[in-house]
Regions:
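Active-site loop-to-helix "anion-binding N-cap" substructures in soluble metabolic enzymes
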Residues: 1-258
Length: 258
């Protein structure tokens, strides 16, 4: 996990991201890397029904995030929640673009819809964790970078800003989510380097250095330390492993990056 201006990982609070884990900073680290490290905190995303309950149990330095939001303020969209509702219950973060929203639920959310949600959430004053990643056939076909680049480009097309500030990127290879498979540390680092390079080339070098990039694909206690050792893995977007006592081991694995 890197230090940015907000928290990170599965729990989040009013100006900080969900479950973020720290980032290793070598003895001589860049100004952006140092900034990322100094601003990291802990956070987590909770189902909407349990937000108040979760907030009541946590210390103030833990941030709580919603898991999704709709694309606008209102309308006939039964079952959806708006960014304004999220803010109204005291949250400062929302997760957008998770693979299950993109590929599993209903007709799925395409790149344009996910990006529109990010823009709307930002305009409402929320920080965003934006998930990107490729499916198995795209990984096998060698199009991982092209797929991720299109997902990132949609943000700029929608007028999204905040790279290095209230926008966190979470790389989650779809083929590794809930499957027991996991990208190797080298594969995770490679993807994170590509994302950081993309931001440098399309936004700015400063934004690239300051942007937190999490890894989320069957991250668990058994691989957390190896992932933490990668210089561009700034934190973890943890799913199933966050429901077990071993979750604390994932947190401890990233203490080297504080």
């Amino acid at each position: 996990m890197r230090a940015r201006s907000s928290p990170a990982s599965r729990l989040t609070s009013a100006r900080e991201p969900p479950f973020f884990l720290p980032r290793r900073c070598p003895s001589r680290c860049s100004r952006g890397a140092l900034r990322r490290r100094l601003t990291q905190r802990w956070g987590g995303r909770r189902p909407d029904l349990y937000i108040d309950y979760t907030k009541a149990l946590l210390r103030p330095d833990f941030a709580v995030s919603a898991q999704n939001c709709w694309t606008g303020k209102g309308g006939a969209f039964t079952g959806q929640i708006t960014a304004e509702m999220i803010k109204d219950v005291g949250l400062g973060w929302v997760l957008i673009g998770h693979s299950e929203c993109r590929h599993t639920i209903g007709k799925g959310e395409d790149n344009a819809m996910c990006a529109a949600k990010v823009k709307y959430a930002q305009d409402a004053g929320l920080n965003v964790i934006f998930a990107v990643g490729e499916k198995k056939e795209e990984r096998v076909g060698g199009t991982t970078e092209a797929v991720v680049a299109e997902q990132m480009k949609a943000l700029l097309d929608a007028g999204v800003t905040g790279f290095g500030e209230g926008l966190v990127i979470a790389y989650e290879p779809v083929w590794a989510i809930g499957t027991g498979l996991v990208a190797t540390p080298d594969q995770a680092q490679e993807a994170h380097v590509f994302i950081r390079k993309w931001i440098a080339e399309n936004v700015s070098a400063e934004a690239a250095e300051a942007t937190r990039i999490q890894y989320g694909g069957s991250a668990k206690p058994g691989n957390a330390a190896e992932l933490a050792a990668q210089p561009d893995v700034d934190g973890l977007l943890i799913g199933g492993a966050s429901l077990t006592p071993g979750f604390i081991d994932c947190i401890n694995a990233f203490k080297c990056k504080f």
